[in-house]
From Swiss-Prot:
Residues 1-184, 239-284, 709-738 are annotated as: Disordered. One of its GO terms (biological process) is RNA splicing. A motif (Q motif) lies at residues 315-343. The Q motif is unique to and characteristic of the DEAD box family of RNA helicases and controls ATP binding and hydrolysis. This is Pre-mRNA-splicing ATP-dependent RNA helicase PRP28. The gene is PRP28. One of its GO terms (cellular component) is nucleus. ATP binds at residues 359-366.
Length: 738
């Protein structure tokens, strides 16, 4: 016999049980299937029990309702339903008189007299819908009055009875049978026959002639139409009152007059005065274009311009004031039609006016400022040994090295055939190399603000004759902290070329040479307050051109939003997209940190595609090599930070994936603007988490604006997408939770 357990044994046993419970238990496939089957059986059993309980509850409720109904009928009508069935609805039992007995007449076939009705309501006959129905539940059939009545009533009809109603009584209290008219009225009402006394109903025919229900011989409107109707028809040239056509009236002319009566009176007067026609603006020569045609033209291309004295936009290249040499270069490059920003910005630039251009990303802004700039330089004396040391004629500033080099490539396509030299000054390259490139001078310099400020500050480069300044992506330069550098560079230029408020851009001198005032052009995708402050300081009476709605994504991008939580799920979803979406490379994946880019590029390689990274940790040579490999098709996927999100033009990008949502909606717009360029369509997929609540509201608005995009239901229902969440609100919420 075992002795009592000691405390040590009990503690050891408890410890062993805890360890066994803490260890994971690995189940085989058969055990997992068995557990799943048992769980499913229990769920089915519980569902059946719930349904049985609901059915029993419903049956009890129906039974109680039936009992309550019977009790209510008994209290209301004063009868008691026997076990064999219910009494008649009108209060008559099975053994008494039925519905027809209450009418006071007998069977039509045997001619017997009516019997005296019995029951609690024998003194008055019921009328209304209940008197037309019988629910005797198995009583006597409808065959007249019941036989064997205690007494017979007189069958003589009452004279003068004209309306159906209950049987009248004599002075002695005997019931008087209804008259024949009353019987006919009851029979017609019971059978649902129409009566002649019904109110006429108004209906309309197809020929717009009003037709009533009365007889045609009662129509007095057609009796004599030879007098007043003829006068009315003659007084109304647009048409006759009752249809038809007057002699000598042309139907086509009548319709023309009627449509003209519905036209806009202001437009009709303008058409008569100016002899406008209805031809589309594309079918008219340039000299026949009216102000209305130009207004329609601007609406077609979503062009809005203000500033006074705005020239007409370009319809095509050959109708512009661009020199023939530049037009030949445009044709050689392959620009068939101007983009909307080019249509309006180039005519303004050809007037040498200061310009503010606000347009979407990928809208062709580079050519919009390069073409007027080359025309401006063409009026200045060529560079030689006497003036090349004074610096360039034109300066183009961009926020990033990649964008500056891209602008340099595009500018060279126009400038080299004209004999102009372009030099880029960007960070990441040695100053000596760039100084050597400037030894022979250059008409055009493309630079980033940081490196250009250093070279100007060290007197390596001077701006003594710079007269044409372009700031591309000005909002991005301000965001990157280059506002102070921009002010320093612009202030270092000579004030002698600053345009007075009442001057024109170019003034011819006595010698016949052009002495140009400085022209400043600013292009941006958005207009934050810092950019507006910069424009007010350095631009003189600028013309402002807005294409579409500033700061919106392009209409050719399909935006998709997916809620994906955790890096592992993002990894699996990224690999699935790259393998199954079926879009050709190049593809760009945007991240927020450099280390994330190095991690994501490995996932791209796991998906079977070649990838490369682009961020600030790469040298200038590595960045250029990465972009060139992507353009040449050697690399399929580029993983980049927001460094490449502005202005980088990689042709034919079909897909943009936001591995992480940007912290502002402006950056998101510029990211997805890498695809859907040059009239092509693209797809942008964004991985969203609950931590992105600060931008969910703006993101929902952007997706709703896009006609190509479909709203994610989870995003539409999210609380942060319905109400804007600020950083201060999140901070207060975190303090309350702590």
């Amino acid at each position: 016999m075992a002795g009592p357990l000691s405390v040590e044994d009990m503690l050891a046993k408890q410890k062993a049980e805890k360890e066994a419970a803490a260890k994971p238990k690995f189940l085989s496939k058969a055990e997992r299937q068995k557990i799943a089957l048992e769980k499913r059986q229990s769920e089915v059993r519980e569902q059946q029990e719930r349904e049985d309980a609901e059915r029993r509850q419903r049956e009890e409720f129906d039974r109680a309702a039936e009992e309550e109904r019977r009790r209510h009928e008994q209290e209301r009508y004063g009868y008691n339903a026997g076990p064999s069935g219910r009494n008649d609805r009108d209060g008559y039992g099975r053994d008494g008189y039925g519905r027809d007995n209450r009418r006071g007449f007998g069977d039509r076939r045997d001619g017997s007299g009516p019997a005296i009705p019995s029951g609690p309501r024998g003194a008055a006959l019921p009328v209304g819908p209940r008197s037309m129905q019988s629910r005797n539940g198995g009583g006597l059939p409808y065959d007249g009055f019941a036989q064997g009545s205690p007494s017979q009533l007189s069958s003589t009809p009452v004279a003068g009875s004209a309306s159906p109603g209950p049987a009248s009584t004599t002075a002695s209290g005997d019931a008087v049978p209804p008259s024949q008219a009353e019987l006919e009225a009851l029979r017609a009402r019971y059978l649902g026959k129409r009566t002649d006394g019904k109110k006429p109903r108004l209906r309309k025919a197809q020929d717009k002639k009003i037709i009533f229900d009365w007889n045609e011989q009662d129509d007095t409107s057609a009796a004599d139409q030879s007098s007043w109707t003829r006068e009315v028809r003659e007084l109304v040239p647009g048409g006759t009152m009752f249809g038809g056509r007057l002699a000598g009236m042309d139907g086509a002319k009548k319709n023309e007059t009627r449509s003209d009566n519905h036209a806009d009176p202001l437009e009709r007067r303008r058409a008569v005065k100016g002899k406008d026609d209805d031809r589309h603006w594309s079918d008219k020569p340039l000299d026949e274009m009216k102000e209305r045609d130009w207004r329609i033209f601007r609406e077609d291309f979503s062009i809005a311009a203000r500033g006074g004295g705005i020239p007409h936009p370009l319809r095509n290249w050959r109708e512009s004031a661009i020199p023939s040499q530049i037009l030949d270069i445009i044709e050689e490059i392959g620009y068939k039609e101007p983009s909307p920003i080019q249509r309006q910005a180039i005519p303004i630039g050809m007037q040498n006016r200061d310009l503010i251009g606000v347009a979407k990303t990928g809208s062709g802004k580079t050519a919009a400022f390069v073409i007027p700039m080359l025309d401006y330089i063409g009026h200045l004396p060529p560079l030689n040994d006497d003036n090349r040391h004074l610096g360039p004629y034109a300066l183009i500033m961009a926020p990033t090295r990649e964008l500056a080099q891209q602008i340099e490539t595009e500018t060279r396509r126009f400038a080299l055939p004209l004999g102009y030299k372009c030099v880029s000054i960007v960070g990441g390259r040695s100053v000596e190399e760039q100084q050597f490139a400037l030894r022979d001078g250059a008409e055009i310099i493309i630079a980033t603000p940081g490196r250009l400020k250093d070279m100007v500050d060290k007197s390596i480069l001077v701006m003594s004759q710079c007269r044409y300044v372009v700031m591309d992506e000005a909002d991005r330069m301000v965001d990157l902290g280059f506002e102070v550098d921009l002010n320093f560079i612009l202030d270092s230029m000579p004030a002698t070329f600053v345009k007075p408020d009442d001057s024109v851009a170019l003034q011819p001198t006595k010698e016949g040479e052009w002495q140009g005032w400085r022209v400043t052009t600013l292009f941006s995708a958005t207009m934050p307050p810092a950019v507006e402050r910069l424009a007010r300081k350095y631009l003189i009476k600028p013309a402002t051109v807005v294409i579409g709605n500033a700061g919106e994504a392009v209409d050719t991008v399909e935006q998709r939003v997916e809620f994906v939580h955790g890096d592992e799920k993002k990894k699996a979803r990224l690999i699935e997209i790259l393998r199954t979406i079926g879009l050709p490379p190049p593809i760009i994946v945007f991240v927020n940190q450099k280390k994330t880019a190095d991690m994501v590029v490995k996932y791209v390689q796991q998906a079977g595609m070649s990838g490369v990274t682009l961020h600030s940790g790469k040298s200038q040579e590595q960045r250029e090599a990465a972009l060139q490999a992507l353009r040449d098709g050697e690399i399929s996927v580029l993983v980049a930070t927001d460094l490449a999100g502005r202005g980088i033009d990689v042709p034919d990008v079909s897909l943009v994936i936001n591995w992480q949502m940007s912290d502002t909606i402006e950056k998101y717009v510029h990211r997805i603007g890498r695809t859907g360029r040059a009239g092509k369509t693209g797809v942008a997929i964004t991985f969203l988490t609950n931590d992105d609540d600060e931008v969910m509201y703006d993101l929902r608005i952007e997706v709703e604006k896009s006609k190509m995009s479909k709203m994610n239901p989870e995003l539409a229902r999210h609380e942060a997408a319905r109400t804007r969440v600020t950083r201060e609100m999140k901070r207060k919420r975190g303090d309350e939770e702590e």
